[in-house]
Amino acid sequence: MENIETILRLAEDKILLVQNLKALQEYKVEFLGKNGIVTGELKKLGSLNEQERKEFGLKINKLKDKIQNIIKAKAEILEEQELNFKLAADKIDLTIPARRYKQGSIHPITQCSEELIQVFSQFGFTIENGPNIENDFHNFTALNFEDDHPARQMHDTFYLKSQENNKPLLLRTHTSTVQIRAMKNGKPPFRFIAPGRTYRSDSDMTHTPMFHQIEGLVMDKNINMGHLKYVITTFIKSFFENSNIELRFRPSFFPFTEPSAEVDIRMNKNDKWLEVLGCGMVHPNVLKNVGIDSSEYQGFAFGLGVERFAMLKYNIKDLRQFFEGDMRWLKHYNFGSFDIPNLAGGLTK
């Protein structure tokens, strides 16, 4: 009995002074392990008679339970201490300046495209899309390009090795290809724009091998140049947010429109005229190529370069800067992620 009390006091004294869970586990093994002190006392049962064995066994089990409870209580204290220490170490010092949050922004081409689409949506234009890789028919033949037209030459068009109908496929040189596909697969009336990337073999301050276009088509019965001029004039004034802007429609030539015109603008009377887009009435041959009766339906088409409009509106001097990835330039000309253009609030914030 005295030995059991001695073991209990020894366990209490040692466990009380424990400073960490690792040391506590070592004392658990020392007292309750396979070769521990309490286990050693249990081995004495074999030398006792039945009555003594019963009484001594009961005392040993109580000793074991007390030591287990002492260890459990100490473990809870140590675990709480370790948790508090960890929380204190991980505590955020709110007085330290926060790191700058890196947030993406909207590229001026993307912003300009959204603004252009927003304006045309006010006229009820929908959006049509088409493939970047095209065949000769959709890119040239259906649009009334002659076989010897300069645009078909290698120095103007990117041709691919793959062929279709014994003619090489190509990267589309305009989004007019989308108009052809839409007219072939649908029935008039039409009123849509076709935004997308286009490709031409050219590179300087005002040209890049890849650029963005938006082409539009309106087709119905009794459509005329008056409708074209109204849409273009209203669109230009809305996009540049300037009701006093001057426009002039200058006669021109495009294989797929007749009559054709190029549109020039100037913000003030003393400014030079700037060419911004081409347009015209859809050529009867184009309608014939897509199976539409030109005696019943007429339409007008127009095409503009997104980069050109972005340069004019945001005062960007060199077209190549759009694609150089200069972070300083992008930071200067970028737009906020939530700068969503709308006519009511003003297109560009």
Curated annotation (Swiss-Prot):
SUPFAM superfamilies: Class II aaRS and biotin synthetases, tRNA-binding arm. PROSITE patterns: AA_TRNA_LIGASE_II. One of its GO terms (cellular component) is cytoplasm. It is found in: Cytoplasm. Its cofactor is Mg(2+). One of its GO terms (biological process) is phenylalanyl-tRNA aminoacylation. This is Phenylalanine--tRNA ligase alpha subunit. It comes from Rickettsia peacockii (strain Rustic).
